[in-house]
Regions:
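N-terminal amphipathic alpha-helix/helix-capping segment at the start of soluble metabolic enzymes
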Residues: 1-15, 22
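Conserved anion-binding
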Residues: 5, 17-20, 62, 78-79, ...
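Hydrophobic faces of well-ordered beta-strands that scaffold small-molecule active sites
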Residues: 7-12, 36-38, 59, 67-71, ...
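Conserved, mostly hydrophobic/aromatic
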Residues: 21, 28, 39, 83
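A short, Lys/Arg-enriched amphipathic alpha-helix followed by its capping loop at the start of a domain
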Residues: 27-33
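Glycine-rich, proline-tolerant flexible connector loops at the mouths of alpha/beta enzymes
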Residues: 36-53
Length: 120
């Protein structure tokens, strides 16, 4: 049997209707969302390009949910500083996106942020 308190529902902002983003964000808690999943894509590591820290800064003004920043970018260590200033709870990077895993893990931890590692 699935125990709801042992799982976290994390909603991706990319799935939102951007013309109604404010209302979509307000609805998240009502639907049991416990965390925001914020995809960052650079057009190099993945083909698509998505939002950066400026948009997340605006979004965080309207939510009180933890944020997991998912860096789908080449050289993710270049993005850690910007997102750490936004008081995010987790930064996830792709194992394949960097050769220096130890350094980026230490960098993220030095900002008192939890580390996530995504593997394709």
């Amino acid at each position: 049997m699935i125990q709801p308190d042992k799982y976290i529902l994390s909603a991706s902002i990319l799935a939102a209707d951007f013309s109604n983003l404010s209302n979509n964000i307000k609805d998240l808690k009502k639907f049991g969302c416990k965390e925001i999943h914020y995809d960052v894509m650079d057009g190099e590591f993945v083909e698509e390009i998505s939002m950066g820290p400026i948009i997340l800064n605006s979004i965080k003004k309207h939510i009180d949910l933890p944020v997991d920043v998912h860096l789908m970018v080449k050289n993710p260590e270049k993005n850690v500083e910007q997102f750490s200033k936004l008081n995010v709870e987790v930064i996830t990077f792709h194992y394949e996106s960097t050769n220096d895993h130890k350094s980026i893990i230490e960098l993220i931890k030095s900002k008192n942020i939890k580390v996530g590692v995504a593997i394709n």
